[in-house]
Amino acid sequence: MFLYKIFKGWLWTISIWPLPVLYVFSDFICFFVRRCYRTKVVRENLRTAFPEKSEAERKDIERKFYHQLCDNFFEDIKMLTMSKEEIMRRMTFGGLDEIKKRHDAGQKLHFLYLSHFGNWEWIASINYKFESWGRSGQIYHPLRNDLMDQLFIELRGQYGGVNIKMKETFRRILQLRKEGVNYTIGFISDQQPKWASIHHFVPFLNHDTAVCIGAEHIARKVDAFMTYGRMSRPKRGYYHLDIIPMEDHPASVPENTLTDRYFELLEADIKEHPEMWLWTHKRWSRTKEEWLKRQNAGIEEED
């Protein structure tokens, strides 16, 4: 706890600076970050996702991506001292009327598909929009670094939303449903599942991609209506999330239909603004070929 207070205090001294000043810092450290932080992974991901693009085009995407990544870092730190008025001015939402209409019709649970696109941490401020007619929550996977994990739990929860550990998702959602309160739950669903959790593959960015199906799977069980969040960046320091209806009753459509549709929408967004997606992770390290080999060999443990 003492170490966390020191860590948070250090970040607070950065956070008190206005965002325009923090963006100067962002531009400065970006010069170094783009030369040493997971550059091989980023370049390989871009090469295989966009084989039709020239090397110069991919280099341009890489450059813009690292600027976005560094901006995200300082924007997230800024959350420590950003006022309610400022976050509501900088992070706006469209389609909230569609959510309220369905809540008014009696559906208490709403699942919002999100991605590692733009600044996904600021989306937690959506809870301010629900002060009179609902609440929000977000599914999260604990980070390996305890200090960072505690920080982001605090940052996400400061707007009044509920933090739900990934492994407790279904149980907690059943508890929330019993409360009888309107809930919007955000699912960031573009991460790579573990071997034991792979059940479905989709064509995504020129790869046969293992995907997470948990959001749709749970929505079918609890009759949560589902939407897709389309993130845009009108200008530096400002984001907008359009909430697009997908399906009011997920169990009424064939299984994995909404998962497939989510990745179709996300791929279109990435192709439109590739620099806004998170390219630093080995998204395609678990291939379908290797998965089939493991299935045939009866390998169940994680690596």
Predicted segments, located by residue:
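Non-catalytic C-terminal accessory region of glycerolipid acyltransferases
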Residues: K59-R63, K101-D104, E154, K167-D303
